[in-house]
Regions:
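Predominantly extracellular beta-rich ligand-binding scaffolds that present long acidic/polar faces
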Residues: 1-119
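Feature marks short, surface-exposed loop/turn motifs that line or immediately flank catalytic pockets
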Residues: 32, 151, 172
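Right-handed parallel beta-helix/beta-solenoid
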Residues: 109-116, 154-184
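C-terminal accessory segments
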Residues: 89, 98-151
Length: 184
Protein backbone atom coordinates (compact mmCIF):
# COMPACT_ATOMS: atom_id res chain seq x y z
CA UNK A 1 0.00 0.00 0.00
CA UNK A 2 1.28 3.43 -0.94
CA UNK A 3 -0.40 6.59 0.32
CA UNK A 4 1.23 9.75 -1.03
CA UNK A 5 0.29 13.38 -1.64
CA UNK A 6 -2.95 12.89 0.29
CA UNK A 7 -4.61 15.65 2.28
CA UNK A 8 -7.08 15.08 5.12
CA UNK A 9 -8.19 16.77 8.30
CA UNK A 10 -6.35 14.34 10.60
CA UNK A 11 -3.62 11.81 9.83
CA UNK A 12 -2.73 12.50 6.19
CA UNK A 13 -2.25 8.77 5.50
CA UNK A 14 -3.86 7.08 8.53
CA UNK A 15 -6.21 8.44 11.18
CA UNK A 16 -6.79 5.77 13.83
CA UNK A 17 -9.39 6.36 16.53
CA UNK A 18 -10.42 3.38 18.67
CA UNK A 19 -8.72 1.04 16.19
CA UNK A 20 -6.18 -1.77 15.98
CA UNK A 21 -4.13 -1.44 12.79
CA UNK A 22 -1.20 -3.34 11.30
CA UNK A 23 0.89 -1.44 8.75
CA UNK A 24 3.24 -3.88 7.02
CA UNK A 25 5.25 -3.21 3.82
CA UNK A 26 3.62 0.18 3.27
CA UNK A 27 4.97 3.50 2.04
CA UNK A 28 3.50 6.78 3.31
CA UNK A 29 5.07 9.93 1.89
CA UNK A 30 4.32 13.65 1.59
CA UNK A 31 0.82 13.54 3.06
CA UNK A 32 -0.79 16.46 4.86
CA UNK A 33 -3.18 16.86 7.79
CA UNK A 34 -4.67 20.14 6.67
CA UNK A 35 -5.97 21.69 9.87
CA UNK A 36 -5.16 24.84 11.77
CA UNK A 37 -3.70 22.59 14.49
CA UNK A 38 -0.31 20.99 13.93
CA UNK A 39 -0.99 18.10 16.29
CA UNK A 40 -2.92 15.93 13.84
CA UNK A 41 -0.02 14.14 12.12
CA UNK A 42 0.77 14.56 8.44
CA UNK A 43 1.31 10.81 8.04
CA UNK A 44 -0.30 9.06 11.06
CA UNK A 45 -2.58 10.25 13.85
CA UNK A 46 -3.48 7.77 16.58
CA UNK A 47 -5.93 8.22 19.46
CA UNK A 48 -7.17 5.39 21.68
CA UNK A 49 -5.65 2.91 19.19
CA UNK A 50 -2.92 0.33 18.82
CA UNK A 51 -0.86 0.60 15.64
CA UNK A 52 1.89 -1.84 14.65
CA UNK A 53 4.28 -0.69 11.90
CA UNK A 54 6.80 -3.11 10.35
CA UNK A 55 8.91 -3.16 7.17
CA UNK A 56 7.46 0.21 6.15
CA UNK A 57 8.59 3.67 5.10
CA UNK A 58 6.98 6.74 6.66
CA UNK A 59 8.73 9.69 5.07
CA UNK A 60 6.88 12.99 5.17
CA UNK A 61 8.08 16.54 4.88
CA UNK A 62 7.75 17.74 8.49
CA UNK A 63 8.62 16.79 12.02
CA UNK A 64 5.55 15.47 13.79
CA UNK A 65 4.55 13.26 10.89
CA UNK A 66 3.40 10.73 13.49
CA UNK A 67 1.26 11.83 16.42
CA UNK A 68 0.51 9.39 19.22
CA UNK A 69 -2.27 10.85 21.33
CA UNK A 70 -3.97 9.52 24.44
CA UNK A 71 -6.78 12.05 24.53
CA UNK A 72 -9.69 9.70 25.23
CA UNK A 73 -8.00 6.43 26.20
CA UNK A 74 -4.85 4.31 25.93
CA UNK A 75 -2.93 4.59 22.66
CA UNK A 76 0.11 2.55 21.62
CA UNK A 77 2.47 2.60 18.63
CA UNK A 78 4.81 -0.33 17.96
CA UNK A 79 7.46 0.23 15.27
CA UNK A 80 10.11 -2.18 14.00
CA UNK A 81 12.28 -2.51 10.89
CA UNK A 82 10.95 0.70 9.36
CA UNK A 83 12.36 3.93 7.95
CA UNK A 84 10.79 6.77 9.95
CA UNK A 85 11.60 10.40 9.11
CA UNK A 86 12.85 12.07 12.27
CA UNK A 87 13.42 8.72 13.99
CA UNK A 88 12.14 8.10 17.49
CA UNK A 89 12.55 11.77 18.56
CA UNK A 90 10.39 12.85 15.60
CA UNK A 91 7.30 11.07 16.95
CA UNK A 92 5.10 13.35 18.99
CA UNK A 93 3.72 11.60 22.06
CA UNK A 94 0.96 13.46 23.87
CA UNK A 95 -1.02 12.80 27.05
CA UNK A 96 0.70 9.55 28.03
CA UNK A 97 0.64 7.61 24.76
CA UNK A 98 2.99 4.61 24.66
CA UNK A 99 5.69 4.21 21.98
CA UNK A 100 7.49 0.88 21.55
CA UNK A 101 10.51 1.65 19.34
CA UNK A 102 11.86 -1.83 18.56
CA UNK A 103 14.79 -3.24 16.56
CA UNK A 104 15.76 -2.38 13.01
CA UNK A 105 14.40 1.15 12.61
CA UNK A 106 16.32 3.76 10.63
CA UNK A 107 16.03 7.48 9.89
CA UNK A 108 17.58 7.83 6.43
CA UNK A 109 16.29 9.23 3.15
CA UNK A 110 14.76 6.16 1.47
CA UNK A 111 15.99 7.38 -1.93
CA UNK A 112 12.82 6.90 -3.96
CA UNK A 113 13.28 6.93 -7.74
CA UNK A 114 11.05 9.97 -8.36
CA UNK A 115 8.47 10.76 -5.65
CA UNK A 116 7.37 13.98 -7.41
CA UNK A 117 6.08 11.74 -10.21
CA UNK A 118 4.67 9.14 -7.77
CA UNK A 119 7.50 6.68 -8.42
CA UNK A 120 8.20 5.16 -5.00
CA UNK A 121 10.47 2.38 -6.22
CA UNK A 122 13.78 2.28 -4.33
CA UNK A 123 17.00 3.30 -6.06
CA UNK A 124 19.95 0.92 -6.02
CA UNK A 125 21.56 2.94 -3.18
CA UNK A 126 18.50 2.97 -0.91
CA UNK A 127 19.19 2.16 2.76
CA UNK A 128 15.79 0.38 2.81
CA UNK A 129 17.01 -2.48 0.60
CA UNK A 130 17.52 -5.72 2.61
CA UNK A 131 16.77 -3.73 5.80
CA UNK A 132 13.42 -5.28 6.75
CA UNK A 133 12.77 -7.87 9.43
CA UNK A 134 15.08 -10.85 8.74
CA UNK A 135 12.35 -13.16 10.09
CA UNK A 136 9.90 -11.99 7.39
CA UNK A 137 9.53 -13.96 4.15
CA UNK A 138 12.38 -13.29 1.72
CA UNK A 139 12.04 -10.92 -1.23
CA UNK A 140 11.40 -12.46 -4.68
CA UNK A 141 15.16 -12.19 -5.34
CA UNK A 142 15.88 -14.42 -2.31
CA UNK A 143 17.32 -11.68 -0.07
CA UNK A 144 16.14 -10.18 3.22
CA UNK A 145 12.91 -8.27 2.74
CA UNK A 146 13.06 -4.57 1.92
CA UNK A 147 11.27 -1.76 3.73
CA UNK A 148 8.33 -0.16 1.97
CA UNK A 149 5.71 -1.23 -0.54
CA UNK A 150 8.10 -2.29 -3.32
CA UNK A 151 10.84 -4.91 -3.34
CA UNK A 152 14.08 -4.09 -5.13
CA UNK A 153 14.83 -4.93 -7.89
CA UNK A 154 11.37 -4.90 -9.32
CA UNK A 155 11.06 -4.59 -13.05
CA UNK A 156 7.46 -3.43 -13.07
CA UNK A 157 6.10 -0.05 -14.00
CA UNK A 158 4.20 1.81 -11.26
CA UNK A 159 0.50 1.01 -11.36
CA UNK A 160 -1.52 3.93 -12.65
CA UNK A 161 -4.78 2.23 -11.71
CA UNK A 162 -7.99 3.93 -10.71
CA UNK A 163 -8.15 6.70 -8.14
CA UNK A 164 -10.89 6.47 -5.54
CA UNK A 165 -12.08 9.35 -3.36
CA UNK A 166 -13.10 9.14 0.29
CA UNK A 167 -14.98 11.87 2.16
CA UNK A 168 -16.66 12.23 5.53
CA UNK A 169 -19.99 12.83 3.79
CA UNK A 170 -19.42 9.96 1.34
CA UNK A 171 -21.32 6.69 1.12
CA UNK A 172 -19.81 3.22 0.71
CA UNK A 173 -22.52 2.39 -1.83
CA UNK A 174 -21.12 5.13 -4.11
CA UNK A 175 -18.66 4.42 -6.93
CA UNK A 176 -15.73 6.29 -5.31
CA UNK A 177 -15.47 8.91 -8.04
CA UNK A 178 -14.83 12.55 -7.08
CA UNK A 179 -18.53 13.45 -7.30
CA UNK A 180 -19.63 10.29 -5.42
CA UNK A 181 -16.93 9.48 -2.82
CA UNK A 182 -16.80 6.48 -0.51
CA UNK A 183 -17.22 6.97 3.26
CA UNK A 184 -14.41 4.56 4.21
Amino acid sequence: LIIAHNQTGMGGAICAIQSDIQIVHCTFSDNNAATQWSEYGDEIYSNESTIMVQNSIIWGTNDGDIILDDFSGPSELIISYSDIRGGEPGILIENGGLLNWLDGNINQDPLFVNPDENDYLLTVDSPCINAGNPDSPLDPDGTITDMGAYSFPLNLEPNNGPIFYIAQDGDDSNNGFFEFPFAS
